Amino acid sequence: MRVKGGTVSRARRKKFVKLAKGYRGQRRINYKVAKQQVYKSYLYAYRDRKNTKRNFRKLWIARINAAARMNGLSYSKLMHGLTLAGVELNRKMLAEIAVSDFDTFTKLADQAKAALSSDNVLVQARTAATTDTTVSVER
């Protein structure tokens, strides 16, 4: 006699139909369509877990940029100035400070400006020392 494995097959099919709860139409009733949709849902979930990280980073950068421009700096100059000043705050924390405590963010922006101005003086001195305007080529 052939063994068909009825209870195992039924349990497997019920599992997919149960996972498809909340879908519209045949996607929640029909096993074959439900299985395809559940697999597709897993792909969407995987993709969007990655996209969530990107979207939050974009949001944080937009918030930091808006607050930086209110203090007379661009985003890139603010971040470079904070790096020069030795401030090690990530974008998430900077965005939270910009939204909730603008006075503290202004102090951080002032630190960045000070670090940028001192670095700018060093860069100008370095370029002045390396620039030689009396170059002559003899032929």
From Swiss-Prot:
A Gene Ontology BP annotation from the UniProt entry: ribosomal large subunit assembly
Gene Ontology CC: one annotated term: ribonucleoprotein complex
One Gene Ontology MF term: rRNA binding
CDD domains given in the database record: Ribosomal_L20
Superkingdom of the source species: Bacteria
InterPro entries named in the record: Ribosomal_bL20, RIBOSOMAL_L20_CS, Ribosomal_protein_bL20_C
Keywords from the UniProt entry: Ribonucleoprotein, Ribosomal protein, RNA-binding, rRNA-binding
KW Iron (keyword) present: no
Record family assignment: Belongs to the bacterial ribosomal protein bL20 family.
Protein name: Large ribosomal subunit protein bL20
UniProt source species: Leuconostoc mesenteroides subsp. mesenteroides (strain ATCC 8293 / DSM 20343 / BCRC 11652 / CCM 1803 / JCM 6124 / NCDO 523 / NBRC 100496 / NCIMB 8023 / NCTC 12954 / NRRL B-1118 / 37Y)
Gene: rplT
